[in-house]
Amino acid sequence: MITALRGMKDMLPARAKLYAQIIKTCEEVAKNYGYEQILTPHLEETALFKRSVGESSDIVGKEMYQFEDKGGNDVCLRPEGTAGVVRAFIEAKLDRANVTKRCFYHGSMFRYERPQKGRLREFHQFGCECFGEGSVYEDASIILMVSEIFNRLNIKTTLKINSLGDESSMKSYKEKLVKFLDENDDKICEDCKRRKLLNPIRVLDCKIESCQEIYKNAPVITDSLSDEAQADFAKLQEILTANGVKFEIDTKLVRGLDYYCKTAFEFISNEIGSQSAVAGGGRYDRLVEYLGGRASYGVGFAMGVERIMEILGEAGDERDGVYLCALDAANVDFIYNLGSKLRKKYQVEISYEAKKLQKHLQNADNKNAKIFLCVGENEMKENKIWYKNLETKDEKTINLDELEKELG
Protein backbone atom coordinates (compact mmCIF):
# COMPACT_ATOMS: atom_id res chain seq x y z
CA MET A 1 0.00 0.00 0.00
CA ILE A 2 1.28 3.47 -0.91
CA THR A 3 1.00 5.91 1.99
CA ALA A 4 1.61 9.63 2.47
CA LEU A 5 5.26 10.59 2.93
CA ARG A 6 6.58 10.93 6.47
CA GLY A 7 5.73 14.32 7.90
CA MET A 8 3.06 14.99 5.28
CA LYS A 9 -0.57 14.45 6.23
CA ASP A 10 -3.90 14.40 4.47
CA MET A 11 -6.63 16.71 5.72
CA LEU A 12 -9.82 14.69 5.70
CA PRO A 13 -13.13 16.62 5.70
CA ALA A 14 -13.31 17.35 9.45
CA ARG A 15 -9.73 18.70 9.51
CA ALA A 16 -10.19 20.50 6.20
CA LYS A 17 -13.28 22.20 7.64
CA LEU A 18 -11.31 23.37 10.66
CA TYR A 19 -8.50 24.62 8.38
CA ALA A 20 -11.04 26.60 6.34
CA GLN A 21 -12.56 28.11 9.51
CA ILE A 22 -9.13 29.26 10.73
CA ILE A 23 -8.18 30.75 7.36
CA LYS A 24 -11.55 32.48 7.08
CA THR A 25 -11.01 34.13 10.47
CA CYS A 26 -7.47 35.19 9.53
CA GLU A 27 -8.61 36.64 6.21
CA GLU A 28 -11.49 38.58 7.79
CA VAL A 29 -9.15 40.24 10.30
CA ALA A 30 -6.43 40.91 7.70
CA LYS A 31 -8.92 42.56 5.34
CA ASN A 32 -10.10 44.80 8.18
CA TYR A 33 -6.51 46.04 8.42
CA GLY A 34 -6.32 46.78 4.68
CA TYR A 35 -4.55 43.62 3.48
CA GLU A 36 -5.19 41.94 0.10
CA GLN A 37 -4.47 38.34 -0.91
CA ILE A 38 -1.38 37.39 -2.89
CA LEU A 39 -0.56 33.95 -4.36
CA THR A 40 3.06 32.97 -5.03
CA PRO A 41 4.60 29.72 -6.39
CA HIS A 42 5.49 26.79 -4.15
CA LEU A 43 8.74 26.33 -6.10
CA GLU A 44 11.40 29.05 -6.16
CA GLU A 45 15.10 29.43 -6.96
CA THR A 46 17.19 28.21 -4.03
CA ALA A 47 19.19 31.45 -4.17
CA LEU A 48 16.10 33.37 -3.03
CA PHE A 49 16.10 31.70 0.38
CA LYS A 50 19.88 31.62 0.74
CA ARG A 51 19.86 35.39 0.39
CA SER A 52 16.75 36.12 2.43
CA VAL A 53 16.66 33.52 5.19
CA GLY A 54 20.45 33.48 5.48
CA GLU A 55 23.21 30.92 5.04
CA SER A 56 23.57 30.58 8.81
CA SER A 57 19.95 29.55 9.40
CA ASP A 58 18.89 25.97 10.10
CA ILE A 59 16.35 26.32 7.29
CA VAL A 60 19.03 26.82 4.61
CA GLY A 61 21.67 24.67 6.29
CA LYS A 62 19.58 21.59 7.06
CA GLU A 63 15.90 21.77 6.18
CA MET A 64 15.24 22.80 2.56
CA TYR A 65 13.73 20.46 -0.04
CA GLN A 66 16.35 21.42 -2.61
CA PHE A 67 17.03 19.77 -5.98
CA GLU A 68 18.14 20.37 -9.55
CA ASP A 69 15.28 20.37 -12.04
CA LYS A 70 15.43 18.94 -15.57
CA GLY A 71 16.66 22.28 -16.88
CA GLY A 72 19.62 22.25 -14.50
CA ASN A 73 18.16 24.96 -12.25
CA ASP A 74 18.83 24.88 -8.50
CA VAL A 75 15.33 25.08 -7.02
CA CYS A 76 13.55 24.29 -3.77
CA LEU A 77 10.09 24.04 -2.27
CA ARG A 78 9.40 27.18 -0.27
CA PRO A 79 10.31 26.77 3.42
CA GLU A 80 8.57 30.03 4.40
CA GLY A 81 6.36 32.63 2.78
CA THR A 82 7.97 36.03 3.23
CA ALA A 83 10.80 35.72 0.70
CA GLY A 84 8.45 34.73 -2.15
CA VAL A 85 6.14 37.66 -1.41
CA VAL A 86 9.11 40.06 -1.39
CA ARG A 87 10.34 38.61 -4.70
CA ALA A 88 6.89 39.12 -6.22
CA PHE A 89 6.83 42.69 -4.85
CA ILE A 90 10.16 43.46 -6.55
CA GLU A 91 9.38 41.58 -9.78
CA ALA A 92 6.16 43.58 -10.20
CA LYS A 93 8.24 46.77 -9.69
CA LEU A 94 6.07 47.76 -6.73
CA ASP A 95 9.24 48.72 -4.85
CA ARG A 96 9.54 51.62 -7.33
CA ALA A 97 5.93 52.77 -7.03
CA ASN A 98 6.52 54.59 -3.73
CA VAL A 99 3.29 53.24 -2.24
CA THR A 100 2.40 51.20 0.84
CA LYS A 101 1.42 47.65 -0.14
CA ARG A 102 -0.22 45.21 2.26
CA CYS A 103 -0.57 41.51 1.31
CA PHE A 104 -1.73 38.34 3.04
CA TYR A 105 -1.08 34.75 1.97
CA HIS A 106 -1.68 31.21 3.12
CA GLY A 107 -0.62 27.79 1.91
CA SER A 108 1.88 24.93 2.14
CA MET A 109 5.50 25.35 3.23
CA PHE A 110 8.11 22.58 3.28
CA ARG A 111 10.98 21.82 5.65
CA TYR A 112 12.86 18.56 6.03
CA GLU A 113 12.87 18.31 9.81
CA ARG A 114 11.96 15.70 12.40
CA PRO A 115 8.15 15.38 12.46
CA GLN A 116 6.54 15.89 15.88
CA LYS A 117 3.32 17.21 17.36
CA GLY A 118 2.42 20.47 15.65
CA ARG A 119 5.47 20.25 13.36
CA LEU A 120 5.37 18.59 9.93
CA ARG A 121 7.49 18.50 6.78
CA GLU A 122 4.62 19.94 4.79
CA PHE A 123 2.85 22.50 6.92
CA HIS A 124 0.60 25.49 6.36
CA GLN A 125 1.09 29.12 7.25
CA PHE A 126 -1.00 32.25 7.19
CA GLY A 127 1.02 35.43 6.92
CA CYS A 128 0.89 39.16 6.21
CA GLU A 129 3.53 41.47 4.78
CA CYS A 130 3.46 45.28 4.64
CA PHE A 131 5.89 47.14 2.38
CA GLY A 132 6.68 50.85 2.28
CA GLU A 133 5.63 51.82 5.82
CA GLY A 134 8.38 52.54 8.34
CA SER A 135 6.23 53.77 11.21
CA VAL A 136 6.24 51.82 14.46
CA TYR A 137 2.46 52.19 14.35
CA GLU A 138 2.49 49.58 11.55
CA ASP A 139 4.54 47.22 13.75
CA ALA A 140 1.90 47.68 16.44
CA SER A 141 -0.92 47.12 13.93
CA ILE A 142 0.64 43.81 12.85
CA ILE A 143 0.80 42.66 16.47
CA LEU A 144 -2.76 43.86 17.18
CA MET A 145 -3.94 41.97 14.09
CA VAL A 146 -2.43 38.70 15.33
CA SER A 147 -3.85 39.32 18.79
CA GLU A 148 -7.31 39.87 17.29
CA ILE A 149 -7.08 36.61 15.31
CA PHE A 150 -6.26 34.63 18.46
CA ASN A 151 -9.04 36.40 20.37
CA ARG A 152 -11.57 35.42 17.69
CA LEU A 153 -10.30 31.83 17.73
CA ASN A 154 -10.48 31.87 21.56
CA ILE A 155 -6.82 30.87 21.92
CA LYS A 156 -4.83 32.06 24.93
CA THR A 157 -1.29 33.19 24.15
CA THR A 158 1.62 35.08 25.68
CA LEU A 159 3.13 37.85 23.57
CA LYS A 160 6.90 38.32 23.73
CA ILE A 161 8.56 41.32 22.12
CA ASN A 162 12.11 42.56 21.58
CA SER A 163 13.96 45.16 19.56
CA LEU A 164 16.90 44.17 17.39
CA GLY A 165 17.70 47.84 16.85
CA ASP A 166 18.79 49.55 13.66
CA GLU A 167 22.07 49.12 11.78
CA SER A 168 24.15 51.16 14.24
CA SER A 169 22.56 49.37 17.21
CA MET A 170 23.30 45.97 15.71
CA LYS A 171 26.92 46.85 14.89
CA SER A 172 27.54 47.91 18.48
CA TYR A 173 25.78 44.86 19.91
CA LYS A 174 27.55 42.36 17.65
CA GLU A 175 30.94 43.65 18.80
CA LYS A 176 29.97 43.06 22.44
CA LEU A 177 28.42 39.66 21.68
CA VAL A 178 31.39 38.38 19.64
CA LYS A 179 33.73 39.37 22.46
CA PHE A 180 31.54 37.40 24.90
CA LEU A 181 31.44 34.39 22.54
CA ASP A 182 35.22 34.43 22.09
CA GLU A 183 35.59 34.31 25.87
CA ASN A 184 33.29 31.25 25.97
CA ASP A 185 34.37 29.59 22.73
CA ASP A 186 35.35 26.32 24.42
CA LYS A 187 31.90 25.99 26.01
CA ILE A 188 29.52 26.63 23.09
CA CYS A 189 28.31 24.03 20.56
CA GLU A 190 29.67 23.64 17.02
CA ASP A 191 26.55 25.21 15.49
CA CYS A 192 27.03 28.29 17.65
CA LYS A 193 30.68 28.51 16.62
CA ARG A 194 29.52 28.53 12.99
CA ARG A 195 26.85 31.12 13.73
CA LYS A 196 29.42 33.30 15.50
CA LEU A 197 31.25 33.66 12.19
CA LEU A 198 28.20 34.05 9.94
CA ASN A 199 25.63 35.90 12.07
CA PRO A 200 26.53 36.09 15.77
CA ILE A 201 23.12 37.21 17.01
CA ARG A 202 21.61 33.88 15.99
CA VAL A 203 23.49 32.04 18.75
CA LEU A 204 20.77 33.36 21.09
CA ASP A 205 18.30 31.16 19.20
CA CYS A 206 20.24 27.97 20.04
CA LYS A 207 18.05 25.26 21.59
CA ILE A 208 20.88 23.40 23.38
CA GLU A 209 20.46 23.76 27.14
CA SER A 210 24.17 24.17 27.95
CA CYS A 211 24.42 27.03 25.46
CA GLN A 212 21.30 28.69 26.86
CA GLU A 213 22.87 28.61 30.34
CA ILE A 214 25.93 30.44 28.99
CA TYR A 215 23.84 33.01 27.13
CA LYS A 216 22.04 34.00 30.33
CA ASN A 217 25.15 36.10 31.00
CA ALA A 218 25.47 37.43 27.44
CA PRO A 219 25.19 41.15 26.70
CA VAL A 220 21.59 42.35 26.31
CA ILE A 221 20.68 43.79 22.92
CA THR A 222 18.36 46.45 24.33
CA ASP A 223 21.39 48.03 26.07
CA SER A 224 22.87 48.80 22.63
CA LEU A 225 19.86 50.46 21.02
CA SER A 226 20.32 53.80 19.27
CA ASP A 227 18.16 56.71 20.41
CA GLU A 228 15.82 56.20 17.43
CA ALA A 229 15.47 52.44 17.99
CA GLN A 230 14.96 52.98 21.72
CA ALA A 231 12.23 55.56 21.04
CA ASP A 232 10.46 53.22 18.59
CA PHE A 233 10.57 50.33 21.08
CA ALA A 234 9.16 52.55 23.84
CA LYS A 235 6.41 53.75 21.49
CA LEU A 236 5.53 50.17 20.54
CA GLN A 237 5.07 49.27 24.20
CA GLU A 238 2.96 52.39 24.74
CA ILE A 239 0.64 51.54 21.80
CA LEU A 240 0.21 47.92 22.87
CA THR A 241 -0.56 48.94 26.45
CA ALA A 242 -3.08 51.56 25.29
CA ASN A 243 -4.85 48.86 23.26
CA GLY A 244 -5.04 46.40 26.14
CA VAL A 245 -2.46 43.96 24.77
CA LYS A 246 -0.25 42.44 27.46
CA PHE A 247 3.36 41.56 26.60
CA GLU A 248 6.68 40.43 28.02
CA ILE A 249 10.06 41.80 26.91
CA ASP A 250 12.38 38.94 25.95
CA THR A 251 15.86 40.28 25.17
CA LYS A 252 16.93 36.87 23.82
CA LEU A 253 14.17 36.81 21.20
CA VAL A 254 15.91 37.07 17.82
CA ARG A 255 13.62 34.98 15.58
CA GLY A 256 15.16 32.34 13.32
CA LEU A 257 15.78 34.52 10.27
CA ASP A 258 18.62 36.86 9.39
CA TYR A 259 16.78 39.85 7.93
CA TYR A 260 14.97 41.23 10.99
CA CYS A 261 15.68 44.65 12.50
CA LYS A 262 13.98 46.67 15.21
CA THR A 263 10.71 44.93 16.24
CA ALA A 264 10.66 41.16 16.73
CA PHE A 265 7.78 39.31 18.38
CA GLU A 266 6.33 35.87 19.08
CA PHE A 267 2.99 34.63 20.35
CA ILE A 268 3.54 31.61 22.61
CA SER A 269 1.03 28.94 23.59
CA ASN A 270 1.43 26.13 26.12
CA GLU A 271 -1.79 24.41 25.04
CA ILE A 272 0.02 21.81 22.91
CA GLY A 273 2.44 20.56 25.51
CA SER A 274 5.66 22.52 26.05
CA GLN A 275 5.67 26.23 25.25
CA SER A 276 5.49 26.65 21.50
CA ALA A 277 5.49 29.66 19.17
CA VAL A 278 2.22 29.78 17.21
CA ALA A 279 2.97 33.06 15.42
CA GLY A 280 5.91 35.36 15.01
CA GLY A 281 7.28 38.18 12.96
CA GLY A 282 8.79 41.61 12.99
CA ARG A 283 10.44 44.28 10.89
CA TYR A 284 12.80 43.54 7.96
CA ASP A 285 13.72 46.90 6.42
CA ARG A 286 16.81 45.46 4.67
CA LEU A 287 15.25 42.47 2.92
CA VAL A 288 13.85 44.15 -0.21
CA GLU A 289 17.25 45.69 -0.95
CA TYR A 290 19.02 42.37 -0.19
CA LEU A 291 16.93 40.74 -2.91
CA GLY A 292 17.76 43.33 -5.55
CA GLY A 293 14.92 45.81 -5.06
CA ARG A 294 14.91 49.46 -4.16
CA ALA A 295 15.30 49.94 -0.40
CA SER A 296 11.85 49.64 1.15
CA TYR A 297 10.48 49.23 4.64
CA GLY A 298 8.97 45.86 5.50
CA VAL A 299 7.14 44.30 8.44
CA GLY A 300 5.07 41.15 8.74
CA PHE A 301 4.24 37.90 10.50
CA ALA A 302 3.44 34.25 9.89
CA MET A 303 1.46 31.77 11.97
CA GLY A 304 1.51 27.98 11.91
CA VAL A 305 -1.95 26.69 11.03
CA GLU A 306 -1.32 23.10 12.17
CA ARG A 307 -0.30 24.30 15.62
CA ILE A 308 -3.52 26.30 15.85
CA MET A 309 -5.46 23.22 14.73
CA GLU A 310 -3.82 21.17 17.49
CA ILE A 311 -5.03 23.71 20.04
CA LEU A 312 -8.58 23.91 18.69
CA GLY A 313 -9.07 20.17 18.13
CA GLU A 314 -11.67 18.99 15.63
CA ALA A 315 -14.00 21.36 13.81
CA GLY A 316 -17.17 22.39 15.56
CA ASP A 317 -20.19 20.14 15.06
CA GLU A 318 -22.58 22.86 13.88
CA ARG A 319 -25.22 21.42 11.60
CA ASP A 320 -25.23 22.68 8.05
CA GLY A 321 -26.91 21.99 4.73
CA VAL A 322 -29.94 20.05 3.49
CA TYR A 323 -30.48 16.29 3.26
CA LEU A 324 -33.05 15.43 0.55
CA CYS A 325 -34.54 11.95 0.13
CA ALA A 326 -37.44 9.82 -1.09
CA LEU A 327 -39.25 6.90 0.55
CA ASP A 328 -40.18 5.29 -2.78
CA ALA A 329 -37.98 4.42 -5.76
CA ALA A 330 -40.52 6.00 -8.11
CA ASN A 331 -39.78 9.42 -6.59
CA VAL A 332 -35.96 9.37 -6.73
CA ASP A 333 -35.93 11.13 -10.13
CA PHE A 334 -38.19 13.84 -8.72
CA ILE A 335 -36.03 14.57 -5.66
CA TYR A 336 -32.87 14.46 -7.81
CA ASN A 337 -34.25 17.16 -10.13
CA LEU A 338 -35.50 19.16 -7.14
CA GLY A 339 -32.11 18.88 -5.44
CA SER A 340 -30.29 20.02 -8.59
CA LYS A 341 -32.35 23.21 -8.61
CA LEU A 342 -31.86 23.80 -4.88
CA ARG A 343 -28.07 23.41 -5.26
CA LYS A 344 -27.98 26.73 -7.10
CA LYS A 345 -28.61 28.38 -3.71
CA TYR A 346 -28.11 25.78 -0.98
CA GLN A 347 -25.78 23.01 0.16
CA VAL A 348 -27.77 19.85 -0.63
CA GLU A 349 -27.01 16.16 -0.09
CA ILE A 350 -29.29 13.97 -2.25
CA SER A 351 -29.93 10.34 -1.36
CA TYR A 352 -30.12 8.29 -4.57
CA GLU A 353 -31.78 5.34 -2.83
CA ALA A 354 -35.30 4.92 -1.51
CA LYS A 355 -35.16 3.90 2.17
CA LYS A 356 -37.31 3.81 5.27
CA LEU A 357 -37.76 7.11 7.06
CA GLN A 358 -35.68 6.17 10.11
CA LYS A 359 -32.76 5.07 7.93
CA HIS A 360 -32.83 8.39 6.07
CA LEU A 361 -32.98 10.31 9.35
CA GLN A 362 -29.99 8.36 10.64
CA ASN A 363 -28.01 9.15 7.47
CA ALA A 364 -28.89 12.85 7.71
CA ASP A 365 -27.78 12.90 11.34
CA ASN A 366 -24.48 11.19 10.45
CA LYS A 367 -23.85 13.82 7.77
CA ASN A 368 -24.58 16.60 10.28
CA ALA A 369 -27.30 18.08 8.07
CA LYS A 370 -29.39 20.89 9.48
CA ILE A 371 -32.54 20.46 7.35
CA PHE A 372 -34.17 17.12 6.46
CA LEU A 373 -36.51 17.00 3.43
CA CYS A 374 -38.39 13.86 2.48
CA VAL A 375 -40.96 12.93 -0.17
CA GLY A 376 -43.29 9.95 0.14
CA GLU A 377 -46.30 8.75 -1.84
CA ASN A 378 -48.75 11.02 0.02
CA GLU A 379 -46.54 14.12 -0.31
CA MET A 380 -46.22 13.55 -4.06
CA LYS A 381 -49.98 13.36 -4.48
CA GLU A 382 -50.45 16.64 -2.60
CA ASN A 383 -47.41 18.44 -4.15
CA LYS A 384 -45.85 18.79 -0.70
CA ILE A 385 -42.64 17.82 1.12
CA TRP A 386 -41.92 16.78 4.70
CA TYR A 387 -39.56 19.25 6.44
CA LYS A 388 -37.63 18.75 9.69
CA ASN A 389 -35.08 21.04 11.32
CA LEU A 390 -32.61 18.60 12.90
CA GLU A 391 -31.25 21.34 15.15
CA THR A 392 -34.53 22.54 16.70
CA LYS A 393 -36.46 19.29 16.02
CA ASP A 394 -39.34 21.31 14.50
CA GLU A 395 -41.14 19.39 11.74
CA LYS A 396 -44.01 20.04 9.33
CA THR A 397 -45.36 19.34 5.88
CA ILE A 398 -45.06 22.31 3.51
CA ASN A 399 -46.10 23.10 -0.05
CA LEU A 400 -43.31 22.61 -2.58
CA ASP A 401 -43.78 26.13 -3.95
CA GLU A 402 -43.05 27.50 -0.44
CA LEU A 403 -39.88 25.43 0.08
CA GLU A 404 -37.29 28.06 -0.87
CA LYS A 405 -39.02 30.64 1.30
CA GLU A 406 -38.81 28.19 4.23
CA LEU A 407 -35.13 27.45 3.58
CA GLY A 408 -34.39 31.18 3.54
From Swiss-Prot:
Location(s) in or outside the cell = Cytoplasm
Q: Which PROSITE patterns match?
A: AA_TRNA_LIGASE_II (PS50862)
Which biological process, per GO, is one annotated for this protein?
histidyl-tRNA aminoacylation
Q: Which CDD domains match?
A: HisRS-like_core (cd00773)
Pfam families for this protein: HGTP_anticodon (PF03129), tRNA-synt_His (PF13393)
Ranges in a coiled coil:
none
Q: Which reaction does it catalyse?
A: tRNA(His) + L-histidine + ATP = L-histidyl-tRNA(His) + AMP + diphosphate + H(+)
Transmembrane regions = none
The record, for Gene3D superfamilies, names: Anticodon-binding domain (3.40.50.800), Bira Bifunctional Protein, Domain 2 (3.30.930.10)
Q: Which GO terms describe its cellular component?
A: cytoplasm
Keywords, A to Z, come to: Aminoacyl-tRNA synthetase, ATP-binding, Cytoplasm, Ligase, Nucleotide-binding, Protein biosynthesis
Does the record carry Cytoplasm as a key word?
yes
Cite the InterPro entries for this sequence.
aa-tRNA-synth_II (IPR006195), aa-tRNA-synth_II/BPL/LPL (IPR045864), Anticodon-bd (IPR004154), Anticodon-bd_dom_sf (IPR036621), His-tRNA-ligase (IPR015807), HisRS-like_core (IPR041715), HisRS/HisZ (IPR004516)
Q: Which GO terms describe its molecular function?
A: ATP binding; histidine-tRNA ligase activity
Q: Which SUPFAM superfamilies has this protein been placed in?
A: Class II aaRS ABD-related, Class II aaRS and biotin synthetases
> What Enzyme Commission number does this protein have?
6.1.1.21
The text of the family note is: Belongs to the class-II aminoacyl-tRNA synthetase family.
Its subunit composition reads: Homodimer.
Q: What is this protein called?
A: Histidine--tRNA ligase
Species per Swiss-Prot/TrEMBL record: Campylobacter concisus (strain 13826)
Gene behind the chain: hisS
